[in-house]
Amino acid sequence: MKFSLGTQEHGWVELTITDDIHRFEVIVSNVPNDFINDTMIALSQLLTYENKRQVWLSLEPAYYLMSIARQTDVFTITIDKGVSASNVVYYQASGDFKEVILPIYRSLKSFYNSRNEDLHWPAVNQMEFQNMLEAVALYKG
């Protein structure tokens, strides 16, 4: 699986998730929530004590819901519309830590390490960033 974040522009960033079969692409807003920061927190919690975390991908006013779940050493990422009548799944992939979590982690790390402070995206929460780095390092063992 590949998880990539494009260049942020005026509070919007392109999110692309691909694998050998599927492609999910959407431009996500940082209003009302910073989904990149929320994803960073979700990874930290998922690797330390949670079994499932959800992150809202805001399209103003619509949204997608990204769920990342863990069952033993199998991780699953799902993108859907949340609690809707249709329950349509727009993207889903499962795999081990290297196949699901590392692509997300590397993309988040790259996003924050390469940002320019002039761009219109909230600054990284250094404590949450450090928590994510430590959680991944501990899990990798």
Map each language-model feature to its residues.
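N-terminal intrinsically disordered, low-complexity segments enriched in P/E/S/T
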Residues: 7-12, 139-140
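A short, charged
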Residues: 46-61, 113, 117-118
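Short linear motifs in intrinsically disordered
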Residues: 1-8, 42-47
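Negatively charged, low-complexity tracts enriched in Asp/Glu with abundant Ser/Thr
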Residues: 22-54
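N-terminal intrinsically disordered, cationic/polar leader segments
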Residues: 1-4, 14-30, 51, 59-70, ...
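Long protein-protein interaction modules used by eukaryotic assembly/scaffold proteins
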Residues: 19, 65-141
